[in-house]
């Protein structure tokens, strides 16, 4: 690790060295191509894509799962959605009506670091993927529904 990278990680008090998404977001993990990176978020391809375009939008700071969020996180979710849609457009997805944006509830999320699934085209999800990313089910919630729930709490 370079001194510069080490300093960046050291300064980020919300970094969890054991979290793969923290390591990817802070460029401590080789092999993950960042499709988007800004001061707060990164976006990269899912390692097990369910459709042609399956990306994850992840905060650089370690944030727990969608179950740990409060009203204060609504803007974060909205920004994550914007990054997801922008990444789709940069990758030639033109039909933003045929997408799915959402989160898995614990214990159905494999990584306990908030990550937005960005899927397109949603109409091409296979049978198993339609179950895994089933809209507003016991295990998966759309970003819009999560925002509604957080604002109502």
Curated annotation (Swiss-Prot):
SUPFAM superfamilies per the record? HIT-like (SSF54197)
Supply the InterPro entries for this chain. Answer: HIT-like (IPR011146), HIT-like_sf (IPR036265)
Quote the Gene3D superfamilies the UniProt record gives. HIT-like
Motif position, Histidine triad motif? 113-117
Which residues participate in AMP binding?
46-47, 115-117
UniProt GO molecular function: adenosine 5'-monophosphoramidase activity; nucleotide binding
Q: What is its EC number?
A: 3.9.1.-
Residue ranges occupied by any HIT domain in the UniProt entry: 20-130
PANTHER family in UniProt = ADENOSINE 5'-MONOPHOSPHORAMIDASE HINT3, APRATAXIN-RELATED
Name recorded for this polypeptide: Adenosine 5'-monophosphoramidase HINT3
Which organism encodes this protein? Xenopus tropicalis (Western clawed frog)
Coding gene?
hint3
């Amino acid at each position: 690790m370079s001194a510069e990278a080490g300093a960046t990680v050291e300064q980020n008090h919300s970094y969890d060295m054991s979290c793969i998404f923290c390591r990817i977001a802070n460029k401590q993990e080789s092999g993950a191509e960042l499709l988007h990176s800004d001061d707060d978020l990164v976006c990269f391809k899912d390692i097990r894509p369910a459709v042609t375009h399956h990306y994850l939008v992840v905060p650089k700071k370690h944030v727990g799962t969608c179950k740990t969020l409060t009203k204060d996180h609504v803007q974060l979710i909205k920004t994550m959605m914007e990054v997801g849609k922008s990444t789709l457009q940069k990758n030639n997805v033109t039909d933003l009506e045929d997408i799915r944006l959402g989160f898995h509830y614990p214990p159905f999320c494999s990584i306990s670091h908030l990550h937005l699934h960005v899927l397109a085209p949603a109409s091409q999800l296979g049978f198993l993927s339609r179950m895994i990313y089933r809209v507003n089910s016991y295990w998966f919630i759309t970003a819009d529904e999560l925002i509604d729930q957080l604002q109502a709490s």
